[in-house]
Amino acid sequence: MNELPIEPVELKRPYPRTVKLGDGTAVRLRLMEPGDVHRVLAFARSLPADDLQFLRVDITRMLVVMLWAQNIKAGHTVTGLAEQDREVVGYASVHHDQVSWQRHLGELRVQVAPAFRSKGLGTVLGREIFAIAPEMGIEKIVAHMTPDQEQAIALVKRSGFQQEAVLHDFVIDRSGRKNDLVVMTCDVAALAGSAS
């Protein structure tokens, strides 16, 4: 089914704003805009190869990031960026198909620069998504990972996600190897209040 062009949701959550991480590091949070393609591309290309291995799409490719920006403009995706010194240091994104039978679901994607890990940035970004999800009509967030992404699985479990399924040989990594896919979900209503 082809998606109809949908206008982006007008979010009430204030952006941009500065937050302090657990170690006192300040980062600026704001929403990604179509004009951020080159900055997001620079961030993606700065990530270690291991981080890119299991991404759903290759965000180091200009075309992929341009399509991402088009999805933002069309209202299918909302991405929160974390910046320091005008450089992207992390993002959380939720993709939402507003016209399908899964219109109550949002797919979560989070990526944090290595220098900003273990500081709580991934948690901050995830909470931003949970805070804005109700405004988008999202009732449940879905996260996909491979079983060897142990840190990511632990993070989403701590955030209230539960494992729903393991799909065997379901994804192919960048080297062409098949991997299992772990599907985890979390009800937005259960966590949205803690995100505000």
What is the predicted function of each stretch?
Residues 27-39:
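A short beta-loop-alpha structural element at the N-terminal edge
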Residues 116, 120-128:
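Conserved acetyl-CoA pyrophosphate-binding loop and the N-cap/start of the following alpha-helix
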Residues 126, 133-145:
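Conserved GNAT acetyl-CoA-binding A-motif
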Residues 142-145, 157, 162-179:
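Conserved catalytic-core motifs of GNAT/GCN5-like acyltransferases
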Residues 57-104, 109-113, 126, 187-189:
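Acetyl-CoA-dependent GNAT
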Residues 25-27, 85-91, 179:
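Glycine-rich phosphate/pyrophosphate-binding loop shared by adenosine-nucleotide-utilizing enzymes
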Residues 117, 143-153:
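Conserved beta-strand-loop-alpha-helix junction that forms the acyl-donor binding cleft
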Residues 169-196:
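C-terminal "cap" of GNAT-fold acetyltransferases
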